[in-house]
């Protein structure tokens, strides 16, 4: 969680700048309605706010590059611990985390570095091709391709880190397998990604439709700091384990399948091991 604090800080700072701009516009609207300010001042304020938004978005995305890039090795460590929990296996939180970071830091850093530049590249390409569509509708094709590439990459991350800490793969094989599984299990993958965004959506609704934006942001930050990040990773790891059991483990000699799942035989074994008279 600590390694994600810079990212959270950048996002919160940008959200506060955007919110303060909305508050100023709302205040100016009330002044215009009461005759305390001219309508021309409100139009200028709206134009300034609209002109500020592209700069604010670009600045935020650029600042997020180093913040996200440093998270990869630590995310690999978390993925190893959470994967063991999802398998119902014991994990020494600190020592296993540290060992997983040491063993997977290169692939983890490369993965997070690519992830960090994705939003900037997507925003620039989407804006550029969006402007070019005024000249030719053919530019919709690369614009849609940008959306598809980013979505597939983000969905592939659900499988990338668990694979990284489970199998010995080069980075190309890691990315290829993740993309194949993300596309092959697209409905569930997208559904789980959207499910992880529900708290963010609820906070956004509270912020937009009530005067309690500060409390919504505080609750959102506390949720992700306390359980949100770990819970979403646990759910993702559980599903990734099931996908690996279907597509990867049957092709590996001696690989166990179904770890972490309930089996009726487990209850029978416990009854057999119980002392007589109990």
Where are the model-predicted features located?
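Hydrophobic alpha-helical membrane segments
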Residues: 1-278
